[in-house]
Regions:
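Substrate-binding surface in catalytic domains of secreted glycosidases
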Residues: 27-35, 80, 103, 107-228
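Glycan-recognition patch characteristic of GH18 chitinases/ENGases
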Residues: 1-81
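Substrate-binding clefts and substrate-entry loops adjacent to catalytic sites
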Residues: 56-66, 94, 159-166
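Structural recognition of alpha->loop->beta junctions
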Residues: 13-17, 70-98, 142-162
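Electropositive, surface-exposed helix/loop patches at the edges of structured domains
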Residues: 6-9, 85-98, 170-177, 196
Length: 229
């Protein structure tokens, strides 16, 4: 995918930041695996585009993200690895995309990780952004207000209102869902720090009657929207 950057940018306009998924948790000591590319970064910089590399916790099922975040030594290993990679590849920023964390296991450790990473980012001129679900009771431990104190930007993932596991078919991101997500996030995050994440895909649903009782089962296919000018 790194090699397609030129063709992708040729058919788009108005982009000032790209956030490729380049890093993921690779072991329980806080090490990361990397897909980063210097030529990708160079090409973006030549075209006036910043690169905020994304770090994910979802790619390696053998890694316990909650355990890494809950120990000072492994958090330190992780933050150091990210800063080292950012310097090596001349990255403009780091985007943290840690999803599906277990609140009982992680507690306040996630926000402590953001605090510690933010200090190292600031010391090295690296922009820090953090991805977030739409506000709800079960995601309150992500602590968006505290994120806004330390991160440069808080990113709202305003999509997956309905998904493959939903009990009913529906929109990926209806206007009411997105509006409420933005309004609720703005209660904790200053507007100038909020980035709205919109989906470039939709879901095509089909309903199948179940046992003739009037109920239905839903299945979906994801269809990407092509970026174009």
């Amino acid at each position: 995918a790194n090699g397609n950057i030129a063709s992708v940018l040729q058919s788009t306009k108005g982009i000032n930041v790209l956030s490729p998924t380049w890093f993921y948790l690779n072991d329980n000591s806080g090490g990361i695996a990397s897909l980063a590319s210097s030529s990708y970064v160079d090409y973006c910089h030549q075209n006036g585009i910043e690169v905020w590399a994304l770090v994910s916790n979802l790619e390696n099922p053998d890694v316990n993200a909650e355990s890494i975040l809950s120990h000072t030594s492994t958090r330190d290993n992780l933050t150091n690895a990210l800063i080292s990679a950012a310097i090596q590849y001349d990255l403009d920023g780091i985007n943290v995309d840690f999803e599906a964390l277990n609140v009982d296991a992680v507690g306040t450790s996630f926000i402590q990780f953001i605090r510690e990473l933010s200090i190292k980012c600031a010391n090295n001129g690296i922009v820090l952004s953090v991805d977030n679900y739409v506000p709800s009771a079960y995601t309150s431990f992500y602590n968006r207000a505290e994120q806004a104190r330390f991160a440069d930007y808080v990113v709202l993932m305003a999509y997956d209102e309905h998904y493959a596991g939903s009990e009913e078919a529906g929109s990926v991101a209806s206007i009411d869902y997105v509006t409420k997500g933005v309004e609720d996030t703005l209660q904790d995050v200053p507007a100038e720090q909020l980035i709205l994440g919109m989906p470039f895909y939709t879901r095509v649903w089909s309903e199948t009657p179940i046992d003739g009782d009037g109920s239905t089962g839903e299945t979906d296919n994801v269809v990407d929207y092509a970026l174009s000018s």
